[in-house]
Amino acid sequence: MNRQPIVQLSNLSWTFREGETRRQVLDHITFDFEPGEFVALLGQSGSGKSTLLNLISGIEKPTTGDVTINGFAITQKTERDRTLFRRDQIGIVFQFFNLIPTLTVLENITLPQELAGVSQRKAAVVARDLLEKVGMADRERTFPDKLSGGEQQRVAISRALAHNPMLVLADEPTGNLDSDTGDKVLDVLLDLTRQAGKTLIMATHSPSMTQHADRVVNLQGGRLIPAVNRENQTDQPASTILLPTSYE
């Protein structure tokens, strides 16, 4: 029996007005994401990667089409229902860490959960467990300005996973880091999501960030185009994908 896709995009389009004309960023995309897989969304700056993640999460609504997450038609819901669903079921990791400077590492992770009604004690237990997993158990009382960029992103990843979301969206999560630090942070993100069986959709402009993905799709001309490997063999790892010439 085939598994039901966790995310289904159906005829999804998004346009915006630029002067007297309308620009089409996403063009009637239909695509399924499977439970527990890591999909790398590869595209140049301005190709619409962030917009697509915003539509999946319900931050924005499409011009046409639908997004369904585990049977929940998020595009058809009210703003309040979309917000509550996002809070409970989706974890988001951004390029910029967005940590609150006046809160400690532990408090940055626990605050969203406390605002959602989780007890302070329970939120702290979860946060400490995540900090242990990302190698920052000794930094829970540290403030963000005392952390390196890689450490701040580890905290942001922990915050995104603290509520045990079914879906994790990562928008250029290593884009503000140097190459070595970015690789280590990506390893942390992949380890945590795979251990927990989460679906991870990561937007990136860097082909090197796609090598561990289960699937790679290129966002070009408003469309999602599945990548193929150089030998045209489906059993090859994602690191052998054939990239559009604009990325090579």
UniProtKB/Swiss-Prot annotation:
Induction pattern: Highly up-regulated during the early stages of invasion of the human blood-brain barrier.
Gene Ontology BP, a term: transmembrane transport
InterPro entries, sorted: AAA+_ATPase, ABC_transporter-like_ATP-bd, ABC_transporter-like_CS, ABC_transpr_LolD-like, MacB-like_ATP-bd, P-loop_NTPase
GO MF annotation list: ATP binding; ATP hydrolysis activity; transmembrane transporter activity
Superkingdom of origin: Bacteria
Domain ABC transporter: 7-246
Signal peptide positions on this chain: none
SUPFAM superfamilies: P-loop containing nucleoside triphosphate hydrolases (SSF52540)
Assigned keywords, A-Z: ATP-binding, Nucleotide-binding, Transport
Reported function: Probably part of an ABC transporter complex involved in host cell binding either through secretion of an adherence factor or through maintaining the architecture and integrity of the mycobacterial cell envelope.
Descriptive protein name: Uncharacterized ABC transporter ATP-binding protein Rv0986
Organism: Mycobacterium tuberculosis (strain ATCC 25618 / H37Rv)
Taxon lineage: Bacteria, Bacillati, Actinomycetota, Actinomycetes, Mycobacteriales
